[in-house]
Amino acid sequence: MICPHQGTCGGCALALPYEEQWKLKESEFRELLPLSKDTPTDLYPSAPHSFRARAEFRLYRNESGRLSYAMSQKGSKQPLPIQSCPILLPSIQALMPSLLEALESDEILTQKLFGVEFLSGLSQEVLVSLLYHKRLDHAWEERALGLLSSLPTLSSLIGRSKGQKIVLGESFITETLTIDSKPWRFLHYEGSFTQPNPKVNEKMIEWIISAPPQGDLLELYCGAGNFTLPLSSRYAKILATEVSKTSIHAAKQNCELNSVRHISFVRLNAQETQSALEGEREFYRLRELDLPSYDFQAVFVDPPRAGLGAEVASFLRRFDQILYISCNPKTLQSDLEVLQLSHDVERFALFDQFPYTPHLESGVILRQRR
């Protein structure tokens, strides 16, 4: 990747040629989890540029008043003015200069504007959020509508200030992911978590659904259904739980968007789900579900960086098959210490969702020992 700011921009921590950093990540993973050296491991590197679907920039004016995007300098909070960012999807890269030019010529839109956020996808829709240290009034909204209409590739525009959000267009983009040649549509909401690297995300989903299905599926940490929807093509019944109200709302919308009827999304955290399935607590949110009718033999988890923790990991040992996507190899290592008391690892996978950073996504398929 050719970037004039590589090595000085704080956004990319690994200033190495892509092939070198990918080999480094694989090596570090295998050292941390020696079992992976003797276990089938599938490798999914990223494209070296034009891969990232989200971006957050500060706004910076130099001494002559010229406006530019900015990142923090490496190892510092000092702003580093930039005009482009080659890791971003082409849809974002193409919009950045024209958006900046339009903003620079409008005093109302730039007054107390401190940040710009981009959200896009393979569908090429682009949603932009403008972040302010001021109350947004009718004059701002009129100028923002003019900005939106003047930029054909800008799908929606959101203005944000403390306690205030003005949506011009939609508060989401509609993304299409192609999984094993089948298109799946998703609403990706501004401000909510979405996978940052859509092409690698497609590979992650394909890898997970390639595992032979068993019985019915329980999913914890389901988010907006990124994995759940494609998994529905493999399982007769799925119960998917998630603590975020916004994500559950989006997941149900995504079900409707794809005409899927055999997933039940419920707002519960992992510990609450465990309590419900073990009969320790009854939840009003589960009142319409016939839990005893489920034949849970498989469980899928995609936990946050903190991992599962010993309690949830112990609970998963009751399932014959465990499908695990991890965004933190260190917590995966500690979770596997618990899971391997009863299960064998059948396969690993490494996914580079975050090139030019130390972060690495991985997958594990485990099966209960007989």
From Swiss-Prot:
An individual GO BP term: tRNA processing
Name of the featured protein: tRNA/tmRNA (uracil-C(5))-methyltransferase
MF terms (GO), sorted A to Z: rRNA binding; tRNA (uracil(54)-C5)-methyltransferase activity, S-adenosyl methionine-dependent; tRNA binding
Domain of life: Bacteria
Annotated organism of origin: Wolinella succinogenes (strain ATCC 29543 / DSM 1740 / CCUG 13145 / JCM 31913 / LMG 7466 / NCTC 11488 / FDC 602W)
InterPro entries in the cross-refs: MeTrfase_TrmA_AS (IPR030390), MeTrfase_TrmA_CS (IPR030391), SAM-dependent_MTases_sf (IPR029063), TrmA_MeTrfase (IPR011869), U5_MeTrfase_fam (IPR010280)
Taxonomic lineage of the native organism: Bacteria, Pseudomonadati, Campylobacterota, Epsilonproteobacteria, Campylobacterales
Function comment: Dual-specificity methyltransferase that catalyzes the formation of 5-methyluridine at position 54 (m5U54) in all tRNAs, and that of position 341 (m5U341) in tmRNA (transfer-mRNA).
NCBIfam families named in the record: trmA_only (TIGR02143)
